[in-house]
Amino acid sequence: MNKFTYENTPLGKIASGYVEEVGAVEPRNTYNQKIAGGEYRQENDHGGHLIAHSLQGSSGLENIDPQNKNVNQIDQRHIEREVASYAQDSNNSVFYSVANYTPVGERPQATMINYSVTNKLTGEQINEYASFQNESHALQEQWSEEVYEN
């Protein structure tokens, strides 16, 4: 079973740990997913896990924040699937870290993900970083268009 640490900081939540197994080990807490963010939750938000349920992340509120559905189901899920594919190879050691930037208790403004894969046989290492604004793809495209118009 994977072990992750969860931390609340003045700038948001951080979760990290080694991914050694793939596959959920506890039932989803759909209630926590529905209440994540409270009054700050927006209409198109999901209760998104910092560490994915499929990577054995906790179903507790320490691991769930309101997250735009595009970010949750497309952007972050893409990275989670990459991490899972690396972790399924027993020759790999996979460290995974996710930070949601915002004061705790509010809707995150951004998600930052880092992961590192080390092949135990060859020593080869892969380091990846991604960050996402916690807004819909349509709104982000609009921002880009406004930047290029000016």
Regions found by a protein language model. Give the residues of each.
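Domain-level detector of nuclease and nuclease-like folds
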Residues: 2-150
